[in-house]
Regions:
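Conserved SAM-binding loop
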Residues: 52-53, 58-163, 260-264
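Class I SAM-dependent methyltransferase Rossmann-like catalytic core
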Residues: 8-54
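Soluble or luminal CAZymes and related metallo-dependent hydrolases
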Residues: 36-44, 69, 134, 138, ...
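Conserved S-adenosyl-L-methionine
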Residues: 215-232, 239-249
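Short glycine/proline- and acidic residue-enriched helix-loop micro-motifs
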Residues: 30-31, 187-197
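Core SAM-dependent methyltransferase catalytic element
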Residues: 237-264
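Conserved class I S-adenosyl-L-methionine
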Residues: 152-181
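Short alpha-helix
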Residues: 194-215
Length: 264
């Protein structure tokens, strides 16, 4: 997905290349960010692995993999999953066939993945992707698409209310109303990140609402409310509660990322 959070086979001591995802020179701040990103992602991965009872013998789909292989935090979940004994598939709207060479054992599938052509998937993992899929409706639909593939999904995303925006590397501006934030980004020449199609940051409240709505709509489509349900005063909002677990790692003093595991 279009993000400068890119990487290659992860290890905390891996050399960071001199250029970022868009071909620009990497600064010392970028190098620190990538090392910190790797540590935070490892925290989220360990939490995810524990929440699903280990990944050995399980089949995981990495949804929204980046084609980048130059940075230490890119596709790190894929490597860790393979090392821990999972069967891993990957899919992306970008060309990622070369990742099968980078990560032996990985199987790349066409995008968008057809659930009917996939083996049974235990969990879909989407790392730092949902903030890049578009507006609120598109983010809900993205979650629904993932829920159509597996009974549980895990999403990670930067926290909108961390004081630093890791995409633009600007502090605090992203706390403004979205329209004002985008207007300032355009003034600063950051037109790519000013487009909602490329970046829509989420808070925990935003993400919880999105996943709740996506699960509710998925359940409604699969099992419509009957007259008997209505007679009992039940609706989709009153059915079994959604099973949602959170991980909120911190960086530079506050929650930097959100990871949510959703079971339907």
């Amino acid at each position: 997905m279009p993000q400068p959070n890119s990487v290659s086979p992860p290890a905390a001591t891996h050399d960071v290349k001199a250029f970022d995802y868009f071909g620009d020179r990497i600064s010392w701040l970028d190098r620190l960010r990538m090392q910190a990103s790797l540590r935070v992602r490892r925290q989220m991965y360990d939490w995810f692995r524990d929440q699903i009872g280990g990944v050995a013998g399980k089949t995981i789909l990495d949804h929204g993999s980046t084609p980048d292989t130059e940075h230490i935090d890119s596709n790190c979940f894929i490597q860790w999953l393979i090392e821990d004994g999972a069967t891993v598939y990957a899919t992306s709207p970008e060309p990622i066939d070369h990742l099968e060479t980078v990560f032996p054992g990985l199987q790349v599938v066409a995008f968008p993945p057809d659930p009917q052509r996939l083996p049974p998937i235990d969990c879909v993992l989407s790392s730092a992707t949902i903030e890049h899929v578009g507006n609120d409706y598109q983010q809900v639909q993205y979650c629904r698409d993932l829920l159509a593939i597996a009974p549980q999904i895990c999403l990670t995303t930067p926290n909108r209310y961390h004081w630093l925006d890791f995409h633009t590397k600007l502090p605090l501006l992203h706390w403004l109303p979205r329209a004002a934030h985008r207007w300032i980004l355009r003034l600063l020449g950051l037109k790519f990140w000013a487009q909602e199609a490329n970046l829509r940051l989420l808070s925990k409240r935003d993400l919880h609402r999105i996943v709740s709505r996506s699960v509710t709509e998925t359940i409604a489509a699969a099992a419509p409310i009957t007259q008997a349900d209505l007679d009992r005063g039940r609706s989709h909002h009153h059915r079994d509660p959604i099973d949602v677990k959170w991980c909120e790692p911190k960086f530079l003093g506050c929650v930097s990322n959100l990871a949510v595991l959703v079971r339907r």
